[in-house]
Amino acid sequence: MAKAAVRKPKKKVCVFCKDKVHYIDYKDTSLLRKFISDRGKIRARRVTGNCSQHQRDVATAVKNSREMALLPYTSTAR
C-alpha cells in the first residue's frame, strides 16, 4: 500500500517585512498582544511567522512593555 502524499505547510510571511515596518513600538499593546499567548508567553517564530530580526524586536518590545506595566507578565492564575 502506498503512503499518502504529505503536504508541506505553507510558510508564514513576516508581517513586519510585508508592511515594511522599521520600528516596533512597545506602547502599541494591541499589536504586541497578537504575539503573546493566552498564558502571557511570547509566541515562537514558527507560530507567528516572523523573521529572526523582527522576532527579536517583538521580544524586546514585549519585555519593555511588561516592565512599563502595559502588558502582564502572566495572564492567568494557577
UniProtKB/Swiss-Prot annotation:
Domain of life: Bacteria
Keywords: Ribonucleoprotein, Ribosomal protein, RNA-binding, rRNA-binding
Pfam families referenced in this protein's UniProt entry, alphabetically: Ribosomal_S18 (PF01084)
Single annotated GO MF: structural constituent of ribosome
Family: Belongs to the bacterial ribosomal protein bS18 family.
PANTHER family noted in UniProt: 30S RIBOSOMAL PROTEIN S18, SMALL RIBOSOMAL SUBUNIT PROTEIN BS18A
Role: Binds as a heterodimer with protein bS6 to the central domain of the 16S rRNA, where it helps stabilize the platform of the 30S subunit.
Protein name (Swiss-Prot/TrEMBL): Small ribosomal subunit protein bS18
